[in-house]
Every structure is written in C-alpha cells, then in structure tokens.
Amino acid sequence: MALDRLLDDPQWQVVGLLTTITAQFDRVAMHGIRRDVLRAQAEALGLPLIESELEYPASNEVYERAFAASLHAARATNPDLNHVAFGDLFLADLRTWRETLLKRLDWHAVFPLWHEPTASLARRFHAAGHRAVLTCVDTTQLAADFSGRDFDPALLDELPVGADPCGEHGEFHTLSYAGPRFRQPLHLQRGENVLRDGRFQYSDFLLDPGPW
C-alpha cells in the first residue's frame, strides 16, 4: 500500500526497492522470504532491487553499516536520490530511529501510510486486489496456525482482540504475491513449517516452476 501511495503521487518517482537479506539463510530476516522469491516479486513489479546482506542476528551498528552501504550504491546509480520510503504505520520510536539514521546519512525518510487506521487499511488492501500470505507468526501474540494463511477478510475476522490487523506490533509478517502493480502474479508452492527461537512460526513459500 505504501508503494501504491507513492506511485499514485506525481511528486514522487520510485526508482527501486531495498531490503535486507540474511547471508547464511538467503532470506529476508523476519519474513523468511527466499531470495529468489523476493527477486521474482521485484521483477513482477518492474522495479530494481537492492539487496543489503547481513549476518543474522545483527546488531544495530552492523545493520546501519549495511544500510548505509546500500544507500551509497543506490545514489551512485541515481545521484539525485534523497528519500527512502517506509511502510510504518504508528510506532513512533521506530519512526524516530529511522529518521535519525537517515538524517545522519544525508537522506530523508518518508512514511506514506503514517497514522492510517489499520483496520480499514488491511481491508482496503484486499479490496484493491492485493494478495498476500502470512509467512511468519509470533506465537506469543497469535496462534501458530495463522502462519501460511491468506491475508484476507476471513483471517482479519479471526484475529484476536488486541492484535493489529496490519501486524504493526510484529504479530505477523507477509509476502505479497499479486496485485494491481504486478505485471503477473507469483506462482508459489507451500513448503514446510518451522518454529524458530521457540517463538516464531515460519511457513516457507517457493516459486512454482509451472508450466504456466
């Protein structure tokens, strides 16, 4: 939804995507999304992808160094770049941390969805044609069997009282595989379920080779 908001706003020109990848697992850290799935997602969206590699777990200092290196690489390709957009919704401490880090690096943070009501935002996501699955669930906040499910109105109706519909407190993480901005949907196969750190239930999703 943050990408939608930026692409619909003529004051912004989106030139690429940036995310962190764990070197030893070859995945997006908390989401558990495989690198090849992430690359297929970026290709389907028609946007270049910058992959910032980290060991996991990584300290804030290590994260900041890797993030700074990625921004330096992005600006080397596009010298006029000054802004990085985030999908954060209401966590003020996280926003302040991002803004402080970027200011130190001579960049500016943008939050297109800031203070959007999360209950309506979650439902608008699906109504607009976006499709996603839950790839990780924090089992201290949600039942493990939410992992792997479609992010749809039925799931939203089943969330327990106190759970944020957009997972802003880390209740869950998702993988978007189709939507209005996708040139074509990602075809995925469900893989195994794994509990990590005695807390995080991951559902693996692999690219389905077809034929299509």
Segments from the language model and where they lie:
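Nucleotide-activated chemistry modules centered on ATP-dependent adenylation/adenylyltransferase
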Residues: M1-W212
